[in-house]
Amino acid sequence: MRQSKKLGQCFLKDKNFVKKAINRAEITDKDIVLEVGLGEGALTKELAKLAKKVYVIELDERLKPFADEITSEFENVEIIWSDALKVDLKNLGFNKIVANLPYQISSPITFKFLEEDFETAVLMYQYEFAKRMAGKPDTKEYSRLSVAVQYNADVEFICKVPPSAFSPKPDVNSAIVKLTKRKPKYSVKDEKFFKKVLKALFQHRNRTIKRALIDSSHEIEIERDALKEILEKIESEFDFTERVFKTPPEKIGHLSNLLYDEL
């Protein structure tokens, strides 16, 4: 079958990386696992051998022959023919996620996952995206994505995966990442506003926090002059001279709360 470029289909073929992903997920016969993207079923079959139940969300119905083969062999596999971004995940009751994700939905599907109550997720991403997810302050990888994902999950970069592991071969390297869901290490008063602050700051990651906020005041929906007044009011409570890319997530959370209190 010819894979769909529109759907970003690159099927994982290398069994070594399939095995590595499953091993890091530590699947047991008590686990209910969610997979996004069936492919030719290489990952699905291995999950089905270990898990209590495997839900697979797949959009491309041309893959039904692979699905039929798998469901005839494994009674614990259920295929959901739909767009993963539109499926209500709350009723599935999964506790783990293992998937070779379509790269064009990496960001939205990851944040959709993070809204759910799961234990661990072992996911395949484009290499550069994976590095940014795991980015730490004062590194080139540290980004809005780093702070947003690490707000309620620990991110572990497991390994780099070469194009030769897939069919067809993608133009970029990939990586396996493990997310371990947890409670936030710091509190924010309004998560939506916090995300707006992140967007405003990281549009200018090399600037000082004060300059970045003023230049992107529209992102937090505060008029520029009004924001300047707010920053002057709270400058005794925060160091606005620090560069965005050097500022730890918990300090950004504190900044978000200070700003939110002034709205």
Curated annotation (Swiss-Prot):
Assigned EC number: 2.1.1.-
Top-tier EC class: transferase
GO molecular function: RNA binding; rRNA (adenine-N6,N6-)-dimethyltransferase activity
Superkingdom of source: Archaea
Residues engaged in binding S-adenosyl-L-methionine: L12, G37, E58, D83, N100
Keywords: Cytoplasm, Methyltransferase, RNA-binding, rRNA processing, S-adenosyl-L-methionine, Transferase
Primary location recorded for the protein, binned into one broad class: cytoplasm
Iron keyword on record: no
Subcellular location, record wording: Cytoplasm
Recorded GO CC terms: cytoplasm
Disulfides per UniProt: none
Annotated HAMAP family: 16SrRNA_methyltr_A
Protein family: Belongs to the class I-like SAM-binding methyltransferase superfamily. rRNA adenine N(6)-methyltransferase family. RsmA subfamily.
Name this polypeptide is given: Probable ribosomal RNA small subunit methyltransferase A
Species of the source: Methanococcus maripaludis (strain C6 / ATCC BAA-1332)
Taxon lineage: Archaea, Methanobacteriati, Methanobacteriota, Methanomada group, Methanococci
Gene symbol of the encoding locus: rsmA
